[in-house]
């Protein structure tokens, strides 16, 4: 086993025995095999398109789902990977039979999970390239594609698809075995950022088209007496279906982690039993889930090894999987609802205060004139985008301290689960504009980009010339894809922490520093001084 795709990788170098995330050696090898077979499918699909042979939507969806399922904290169940690998291989072979071009050696996949795992040992990420810098760039591309695939899959579930984006994903996968130089691979990394921008745009259209544009909404952090279901992950459609199926049952629905922004969507917040938010970010789930007196539903990624005390109360859906945890399909949450009815629920109302969400692009741009006026009058001196992934590794209290120490004439924009380091801080407002604006989930980086571009247009300058600084935290591969999007857009001076990716070599890092002035975080005091002067 060798895996270094997440920020918490062992010793800052790579996991070699078992993943810090909980991934076993066997699952790691199966995922490596799946990536290899997807790379082969990408090669064949790209050749097919060049020859005018149609690639079906089924193959496109299979590709996005397959790539997404290898992202950190999505699927830990080796048996669930067996049909995925076989379906990808079958799709590859069916297309290959129609293609005249030589697509290289195609891996004949084995039968059982154990056999597939053994087979996967031949395809570690270290085999991407003998040259460590070229391998680093190929890893950046593949990890970026995992983020692209996640957003592409989410968007497709909501009916938003783009055949050109699927074609680009296939072509990017086909790059892995090719002998390319630094310049070409850097170009592909930037292309991945462009692809991710499109994927986030599709997902934004899917979310807002189905559920309306988020509006500023107060969300209780306490509880309401009664039966309860907790929804974690990122999937709005799963939440909507659960809300419909629990209407009139007396069960209250709570969000966890990155589901918090769902409270701002008009078509979700209209349900009276959609009550509040429970807990914080993904890495605290063992403690928080153990104390939740109802059923728990994990959508998309961010699952950790369930503790025995709640293993019987937690369910997965979509691409999420953990061995021994009940998986529900087709949007039928009857089992989850039955479990919630069986469990005690909250005994009494509790008041733990409230937080504000719903400051996506439509809301912020709706008060753009007030924001611009505030900047011109000197009331708002600077904007900070402080967001990204949260995690368990020490050093992430930097983000709490940074936000608390930011001057009163600055505005904090935030998104993704990194916000939980400070989401409940009372920072006040500037001329009626809250100083802490929650833009949404990680994919709502699209909203943040639209806000930045609109402000740049209003001030007739480039985004890099705005009084805006990005202080980002990363953990998994969606953060890689978002970073590549920002670099594709030419955004510079990004501060990144709590540590730099293990898969970035010194030479590749030097390129990023020289061209984009990416820098690691230092201390809140030093960074604020450097930014504000």
UniProtKB/Swiss-Prot annotation:
NCBIfam families to which the protein is assigned, alphabetical: hybrid_clust, PRK05290.1
State the family it belongs to: Belongs to the HCP family.
Where does the chain bind [4Fe-4S] cluster? Answer: 3, 6, 15, 21
Name where it's found.
Answer: Cytoplasm
PANTHER family membership: HYDROXYLAMINE REDUCTASE (PTHR30109:SF0)
Q: What does this protein do?
A: Catalyzes the reduction of hydroxylamine to form NH(3) and H(2)O.
Q: What is its main location?
A: cytoplasm
Provide the protein name: Hydroxylamine reductase
- Which residues does the annotation say bind hybrid [4Fe-2O-2S] cluster? 234, 258, 302, 389, 417, 442, 476, 478
Q: How the cofactor binds, per note?
A: Binds 1 [4Fe-4S] cluster. Binds 1 hybrid [4Fe-2O-2S] cluster.
Sorted keywords for this record are: 4Fe-4S, Cytoplasm, Iron, Iron-sulfur, Metal-binding, Oxidoreductase
For this protein, what is the EC number?
1.7.99.1
* Pfam family of the protein (one): Prismane
Q: Which organism is it from?
A: Maridesulfovibrio salexigens (strain ATCC 14822 / DSM 2638 / NCIMB 8403 / VKM B-1763) (Desulfovibrio salexigens)
| An example Gene Ontology biological process | response to hydrogen peroxide
Q: Which reactions are catalysed by this chain?
A: A + NH4(+) + H2O = hydroxylamine + AH2 + H(+)
What this protein needs as a cofactor is: [4Fe-4S] cluster; hybrid [4Fe-2O-2S] cluster
Gene Ontology molecular functions: 4 iron, 4 sulfur cluster binding; hydroxylamine reductase activity; metal ion binding; peroxidase activity
Its cellular-component GO annotations read: cytoplasm
Cytoplasm is among the record's keywords: yes
Q: Which residues are reported to carry the modification Cysteine persulfide?
A: 389
């Amino acid at each position: 086993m060798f895996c270094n795709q997440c920020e918490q990788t062992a010793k800052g170098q790579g996991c070699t025995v078992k993943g810090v995330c909980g991934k076993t050696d066997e699952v790691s090898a199966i995922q490596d095999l799946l990536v290899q077979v997807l790379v082969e499918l990408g090669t064949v699909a790209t050749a097919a398109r060049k020859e005018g042979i149609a690639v079906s939507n089924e193959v496109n969806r299979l590709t996005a789902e397959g790539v997404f399922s290898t992202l950190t904290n999505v699927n830990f169940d080796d048996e669930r990977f067996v049909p995925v690998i076989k379906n990808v291989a079958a799709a590859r072979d069916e297309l290959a039979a129609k293609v005249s071009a030589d697509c290289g050696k195609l891996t004949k996949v084995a039968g059982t999970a154990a056999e597939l795992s053994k087979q996967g040992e031949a395809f570690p990420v270290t085999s991407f390239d003998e040259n460590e810098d070229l391998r680093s760039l190929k890893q950046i591309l593949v990890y970026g594609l995992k983020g692209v695939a996640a957003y592409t899959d989410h968007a497709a579930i909501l009916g938003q698809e783009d055949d050109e984006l699927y074609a680009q994903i296939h072509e990017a996968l086909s790059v892995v075995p090719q002998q390319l130089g630094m310049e070409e691979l850097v170009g592909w990394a930037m292309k991945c950022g462009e692809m991710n921008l499109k994927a986030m745009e599709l997902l934004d259209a899917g979310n807002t088209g189905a559920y309306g544009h988020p509006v500023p909404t107060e969300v209780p952090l306490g509880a309401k007496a009664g039966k309860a279901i907790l929804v974690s992950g990122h999937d709005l459609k799963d939440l909507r279906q659960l809300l419909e199926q629990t209407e009139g049952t007396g069960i209250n629905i709570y969000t966890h982690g990155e589901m918090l922004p769902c409270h701002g969507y008009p078509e979700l917040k209209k349900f009276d039993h959609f009550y509040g938010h429970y807990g914080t970010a993904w890495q605290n789930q063992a403690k928080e889930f153990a104390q939740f007196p109802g059923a728990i539903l994990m959508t998309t990624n961010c699952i950790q090894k369930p503790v025995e005390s709640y293993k019987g109360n937690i369910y997965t859906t979509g691409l999420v999987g953990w061995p021994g945890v009940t998986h529900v399909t087709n949007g039928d949450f009857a089992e989850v609802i039955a479990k919630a009815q069986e469990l005690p629920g909250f005994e009494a109302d509790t008041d733990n205060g409230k937080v504000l969400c719903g400051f996506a692009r439509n809301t912020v741009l709706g008060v753009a004139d007030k924001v611009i006026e505030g900047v011109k009058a000197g009331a708002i001196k600077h904007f900070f985008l402080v967001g990204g992934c949260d995690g368990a590794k020490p050093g992430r209290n930097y983000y709490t301290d940074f936000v608390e120490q930011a001057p009163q004439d600055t505005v904090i924009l935030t998104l993704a689960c990194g916000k939980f380091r400070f989401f409940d801080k009372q920072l006040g407002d500037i001329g009626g504009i809250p100083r802490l604006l929650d833009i949404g989930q990680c994919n709502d980086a699209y909203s943040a980009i639209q806000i930045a571009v609109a402000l740049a247009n209003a001030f007739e300058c480039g985004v890099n010339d705005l009084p805006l600084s990005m202080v980002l935290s990363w953990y998994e591969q969606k953060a890689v894809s978002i970073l590549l999007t920002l670099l594709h857009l030419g955004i510079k001076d990004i501060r990144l922490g709590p540590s730099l990716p293990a898969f970035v070599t010194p030479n590749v890092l030097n390129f990023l520093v020289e061209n984009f002035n990416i820098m690691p975080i230092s201390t809140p005091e030093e960074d604020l001084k450097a930014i504000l002067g």
